[in-house]
Amino acid sequence: MSIGNTIHFLQVPYAEKDEAKALGARWNAERKQWYYYGEEDGRFEKWTPTPVMQLSDLSEEQQSMIALAKTGKNVLVDACIGSGKTTTIQVLCNEVPEKNVLYLTYNTLLKVDAKEKIRARNVTVTNYHGFASMCLEKAHLSAGISDLIQTFLKNKERIRMPKYDLLVIDEYQDIEQEIAEMLECIKKSNPVIQIVAVGDMKQKIYDKTTLNVPVFINQFLGSYATVTFTKCFRLNAELANRLGGIWGKQITGVNQKCSVEVMNLDEVTAFLAKQKTSDILCLGSRRGKMSKVLNNLEDDYPDKFNKKTVYASISDDDSSK
């Protein structure tokens, strides 16, 4: 294929599809993805996905986890912050083309990223509400987004569960009671399914359940091997050591380019304005400085930052913890 016919697939949010189309992007109905032909074009830079990682790109810890998972064993991964746990899952999915894989993420942000980086056609990537919606639709049932999982559980005897060889759970620490019940349904319909659960109890974001997650995940996996990720690619050695001391776990920082800089709100706004919206995740109080910065970005750059921009915030009750 000549350079002029090289195809470049893009990661275009639904809210920005008209903009991409106006710049010359085309729609691939089979992949359900926007693309363009030719040499790399700066017009599409903000939608250009990051390169897909290969097995050889991973650390020794990450490669050992994939090697263990490929033996067919259940695996529990205790991964420190910034250790590339989600990236490792994505590479694993690309490494097992012979398996029918269900990869469950906790939120939409992770789902979008995973769909872009997993090229294998044998992998279903979705969040929990998306999986419930898919199953309900096949059973000719419907529910509002907030009732999807409850409706799934109420009608579980009517639902014909798809068959899977491998269940991958990302961010298992955030599993809630209803999600735990959904996972049990998946396992019941696939009694010999292999399970790989990846997470870090120290990074638990959602804490609105009485479910004892460590007890549940131990029972759910049954017989399993444990792998630990200790290398943090996000922090330098000093910061990682401090955080590890606070959390009481080993974290080895390997990113010596990492630095912490104190900025005022105007400086933060100017800095974020230069970043890709897909690279930004905001955590903080809805009534705090985070919201003020986001409002400033929307006022100053409405075409780039608007209500469709993906970000996460903790509840106001948790903001002081």
Explain the meaning of each model-derived region.
Residues 24-26, 123, 299-302:
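Short aromatic/hydrophobic-glycine micro-motifs
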Residues 69, 151-165, 186-190:
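Short basic/glycine-enriched coil/helix segment immediately N-terminal to the Walker B
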Residues 23, 120-121, 222:
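Short, structured coil segments at secondary-structure junctions
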Residues 105-108, 112-113, 117-152:
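Inter-Walker segment of RecA-like/P-loop motor cores
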Residues 58-60, 74-100, 105-112, 129-131, ...:
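Conserved helicase motor core of SF1/SF2 NTP-dependent helicases
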Residues 1-55:
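Accessory DNA-engaging acidic/polar modules
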Residues 50-74:
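Conserved pre-motif I regulatory segment
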Residues 24, 30, 75-76, 165:
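Active-site-proximal or metal-binding-adjacent scaffold patches in catalytic folds
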